[in-house]
C-alpha cells in the first residue's frame, strides 16, 4: 500500500499478477468462474495481513481485540459465502465435463492432449493441425479454456486433439485447485504431448515445472508421453 501511494500505480505480488492476467484472458463463463474462485481464495489468505497493516498505520498496539478483528471476521464470512456460491456453480461444470469425458471414452478415437509451459506454442500447433483459429499470441496464458477438435492423421487414423491451459513455475495452489475441472481433461487423454520451447534459456526448468503440475493433478507415471521440441529454428 505504501508503494501504491508513493508511485500512484497499482502494485501486485506474483500471485496477484497471475490472477489479473487470468482474469483478462477468461473468455467463457467457466473460465471466469474458475478465476473468481482463485481470486476469492487469494483474498481470503490476505485478510489478516491487510488488517494488521491497517492497525499499525493507525497506531494500534495489537491486532487481537482491535477494530480490525470484528471486520476481518465479517470479511471472511462474506468471502466464504461467495466461495461457496462459485463452487456450487462449478459443480455443474465438473459434472458436465465428466459426462463429456465418458462420452469420448465410448468413441473409437484416442484423445491426445497438448500440454506445456505458457507461451510454448501449443495453440499455434493446435491451429496448424486442426485448421482452427484458437487464439495463439505471443503472450502469457493466451489459452484458458480447453479446446477439442477431431482430426485425421496422415496415416488415416482419427484422433481427438485437446489444447489446454499453459503452466508456469510455482503455479499458485489456488489456481491449480480452481482450474482442476479444466486441467483434469489431461487425465482422460490416451496420449499427452508435451510441447516445449526449445529456444528458451529456461527450457529444462520449464519442463520440470510442467511435469510437477501434472504430477500434482494425478497423472500416472505410466501415461504415454511424447515430447515435442518447438521453436528449434
Language model segments and positions:
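Flexible beta-alpha connector loops of hexameric P-loop NTPases
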Residues: 25-29, 71, 133-135, 165-176, ...
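Switch I (effector-binding) loop of TRAFAC-class P-loop GTPase G-domains
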Residues: 95-97, 103-110, 128-160, 168-181, ...
Amino acid at each position: 500500500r505504501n508503494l501504491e501511494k508513493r508511485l500512484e500505480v497499482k502494485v501486485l505480488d506474483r500471485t496477484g499478477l497471475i490472477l489479473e492476467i487470468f482474469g483478462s484472458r477468461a473468455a467463457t463463463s467457466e473460465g471466469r468462474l474458475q478465476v473468481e474462485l482463485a481470486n476469492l481464495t487469494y483474498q481470503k489468505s490476505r485478510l489478516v495481513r491487510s488488517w494488521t497493516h491497517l492497525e499499525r498505520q493507525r497506531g494500534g498496539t495489537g491486532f487481537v481485540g482491535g477494530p480490525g478483528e470484528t471486520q476481518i471476521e465479517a470479511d471472511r464470512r462474506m468471502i466464504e459465502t461467495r466461495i461457496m456460491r462459485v463452487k456450487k456453480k462449478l459443480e455443474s461444470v465438473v459434472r458436465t465435463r465428466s459426462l463429456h469425458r465418458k462420452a469420448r471414452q465410448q468413441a473409437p478415437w484416442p484423445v491426445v492432449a497438448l500440454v506445456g509451459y505458457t507461451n510454448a506454442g501449443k495453440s499455434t500447433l493446435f491451429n496448424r493441425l486442426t485448421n482452427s483459429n484458437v487464439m495463439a499470441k505471443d503472450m502469457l496464458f493466451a489459452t484458458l479454456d480447453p479446446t477439442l477438435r477431431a482430426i485425421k492423421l496422415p496415416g488415416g487414423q482419427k484422433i481427438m486433439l485437446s489444447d489446454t491451459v499453459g503452466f508456469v513455475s510455482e503455479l499458485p495452489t489456488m489456481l491449480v485447485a480452481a482450474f482442476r475441472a479444466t486441467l483434469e481433461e489431461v487425465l482422460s487423454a490416451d496420449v499427452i504431448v508435451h510441447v516445449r520451447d526449445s529456444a528458451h534459456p529456461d527450457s529444462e526448468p520449464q519442463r520440470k515445472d510442467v511435469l510437477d503440475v501434472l504430477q500434482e493433478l494425478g497423472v500416472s507415471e505410466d501415461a504415454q508421453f511424447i515430447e515435442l521440441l518447438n521453436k528449434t529454428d
